[in-house]
Regions:
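Beta-propeller and closely related beta-sheet repeat lectin domains
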Residues: 73, 120, 273, 280, ...
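Disordered, low-complexity "stalk" and linker segments at domain junctions of extracellular
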Residues: 2-15, 20-25, 29, 64-67, ...
Length: 654
């Protein structure tokens, strides 16, 4: 913005306002405080070219409809070994479908999904596309079918026999778990066999031992034995290498103090709310207070500690629940699994869980070392957390926050709110737990709900300009980035209620073939910092980049009597006469044709001016359109005139 300075007290002092650089949206500030660069309104616009406002991207249906009128619930990407990408869709009927590019959808068999599940998370690892939704057990797509982990039962029928030892006052509590290739069952019912000696006093050379037996479990590959001399505090004691259903405890086995008896069954894999890949392991959260990790290499996706996996309750008693998990980094830059929680206030906390190797006797075990980051920054929107530019962008009930390294400080992760300028808009959103986000074209796009009836708007952060743009009058359940066989990358939206995916592209005009209203409104810009100064505004000018369609340029302002009103409007038309609307001092409207013939604008820069002839204390600019095929970039807005009055108006004293 450039304002010619006022010098002296002459009423003929020239005045000029030029806005040729722009900032983003700022719903936080009132019109008169915004200044010239922030936008009071930027409806259906996007920031481009060093911060210029431009018509937003349009939408069109993409590909074919799901069979039988099935509506979309979720969609993920599976990449084959030849680089071809398949879209894997989950319908609201619980069935899965696949297609390549924009071809026909075919059903995927092997498993169906609970129709009440609404949030899906997809993750591809080692030629398997894992799918979690918080309701169904972990399911994977192997390139042909869905495969769901099959749960096995916990052992039953525990019994025991003493050898040399006799019954006595010393308790020996046992629980047995069964393992398959995926995980471990919950512990069996606790079994207590008393002895006349404490376990650490048994004499092996005297054949003092206990034999514990249990019933075989169908599908088990081996068993683990947990022991304690106190009820309910069993820790891992030993494991069988076969399917034998007996264990001889002679007192020489050492308990593992880091491995307690499981409370959850992982043989079918838990019903993970979300999964992530970090440190060559799969990580999962169950939507309560537990976090799971799998083994590595051939044991990837196996959550039993026998295969390098494990689990840990972290949030017990805090009132928080896990909402999101991802791979991020510590303050030192080391990659680490990072979990984000939620609480009733709509915020929460951030935890990082590095794994450390610890030797117990001749066995090396993996021990988690969770740490909580400072600050009450959590999320309620699992699909809304976005990783971009070495930062996490985290939406919660208070706003959108970032997690990244603090400038000029090493080994420190810092959090801070990014959404201050748009706080009133953001806090007016409904059902923020359904916010979804994606990083695409150096912009972070979010979709959310204003009405409370599904996501119906979009807004975003231009990470190059570090400015917000809002809002777009379209919304989606979530986003999907896909690369077609020809190498073209597209951004797709998964509709709230629809049978086809929606493409979102700068090369498309309109929404699904229909025009949308777009509007840029500046702040109410004072003529001077001195509120008593008025200017006789002689003319206003807008310079548009490659405009098409019908566009209106409106000038508004505060007049001598303190009234705020629309002063004049200019219509800029493609293939139409340019028509001016002028509002006189008495409120009358006159029309005037300025061109003798239709004009088609194809220039990179098209300036259009409008005569004003009004005395104003503050001025505001409005550029808008609702015609089909409209497209424009705002390059510059300006006005000029002369200082009209320097005397304080009498109205100000009333």
């Amino acid at each position: 913005m450039k304002i010619l300075p006022i010098t002296g007290r002459s009423s003929k002092t020239p005045w000029k306002l030029i806005i040729d650089s722009f900032k983003g949206s700022a719903s936080l500030l009132d019109d008169i405080i915004l200044g010239a660069k922030f936008a009071k309104e930027a409806l259906n616009l996007i920031l481009v070219q060093d911060g210029r406002w431009k018509t937003r991207w349009g939408t069109a249906v993409y590909g074919q409809a799901l069979p039988d009128g099935t509506q979309f619930m979720a969609c993920g990407i599976y990449e084959k070994t030849d680089g071809t990408q398949e879209k894997i869709a989950i319908g609201k009927n619980g069935k899965g479908y696949r297609c390549v590019d924009q071809g026909a959808w075919t059903e995927v068999t092997g498993a169906t999904f609970t129709t009440t599940a609404t949030k899906y998370n997809f993750l591809q690892s080692v030629n398997q596309l894992y799918n979690s939704n918080g309701v169904d057990r972990l399911t994977r797509y192997d390139g042909s079918n869905f495969v769901r982990y099959t749960q096995i039962a916990a052992p039953t029928g525990l019994s025991g026999v003493r050898n040399v030892l006799t019954a006595g006052a010393y308790h020996n509590y046992y629980k047995i778990t069964a393992l398959n290739q995926v995980g471990e069952t919950q512990g069996s019912a606790e079994y207590d066999l008393t002895t006349n000696k404490a376990r650490n006093s048994w004499i092996t050379t005297s054949n003092e031992y206990l034999t514990i037996s249990w019933s075989a479990v169908v599908g088990a590959s081996r068993y683990q034995i947990y022991y304690s001399d106190e009820s309910g505090k069993e820790m891992l004691l030993a494991e069988t290498s076969t399917t034998d259903v007996t264990f001889k405890d002679d007192g020489t086995y050492i308990q593992n103090p880091f491995s307690t008896c499981p409370e959850d069954d992982t043989t079918g894999a838990p019903a993970f709310a979300m999964i992530a890949d970090s440190g060559s392991r799969l990580w999962g959260i169950t939507g309560d207070d537990k976090i799971f990790w799998s083994g590595t290499g051939l044991d990837l996706g196996i959550f039993s500690d026998f295969h390098g996996g494990g689990w840990q309750p972290i949030l017990g008693g805090t009132g928080e629940k896990f909402e999101h998990i991802c791979h991020f980094r510590s303050g030192k830059g080391d990659g680490v699994a990072t979990a984000i929680t939620r609480n009733k206030a709509g915020i929460g906390s951030i935890w990082q869980i590095p794994l450390e190797a610890t030797a117990i006797a001749d066995t090396t075990i993996i021990v988690p070392n969770p740490s909580k980051l400072p600050g009450p920054i959590g999320t309620v929107a699992a699909l809304g957390v976005v990783s971009a530019n070495d930062s996490l962008y985290i939406p919660n009930s208070r706003g959108i926050f970032s997690l990244n390294n603090k400038a000029n400080v090493t080994n420190i992760l810092s959090t801070g709110e990014l959404s201050g300028n748009i706080r009133p808009f953001y806090r007016g959103l409904q059902n923020i737990e359904n916010i979804a986000g994606v990083w695409y074209d150096s912009k972070i796009f979010f979709t959310a709900s204003e009405s409370g009836n599904g996501n119906d708007v979009m807004f975003g952060l231009d990470t190059e300009q570090n400015e917000w743009f809002l809002k777009w009058t379209i919304g989606f359940k979530s986003f999907l980035e896909v690369t077609e066989s020809n190498g073209t990358t597209k951004l797709l939206g998964i509709p709230e209620n629809g049978t086809q995916l929606i493409e979102i592209s700068k090369n498309i005009k309109g929404d699904l073939g229909q025009p949308f209203y777009q509007s840029w409104l500046s702040g109410l810009i004072p003529i001077s910092n001195d509120s008593t100064v008025f200017a006789k505004v002689q003319e206003a000018l807008v310079e548009l980049g490659r405009p098409t369609g019908t566009i209106f340029f409106e000038i508004l302002g505060l007049g001598q009597k303190g009234e705020f009103s629309s002063i004049a409007t200019k219509q800029i038309a493609d293939n139409l006469n340019a028509i001016e609307f002028w509002t006189g001092d008495l409120g009358e409207i006159t029309l005037k044709d300025e061109e003798d013939a239709p004009v088609t604008y194809s220039q990179a820069s098209v300036p259009k001016a409008k005569k004003i002839g009004k005395s104003l204390r503050a001025i505001q600019f409005h550029i808008y359109s609702s015609s089909a095929d409209t497209d424009f970039t705002i390059l510059k807005v300006q006005a000029k005139g002369v200082i009209d009055k320097l005397k304080t108006p009498s109205k100000f004293f009333k």
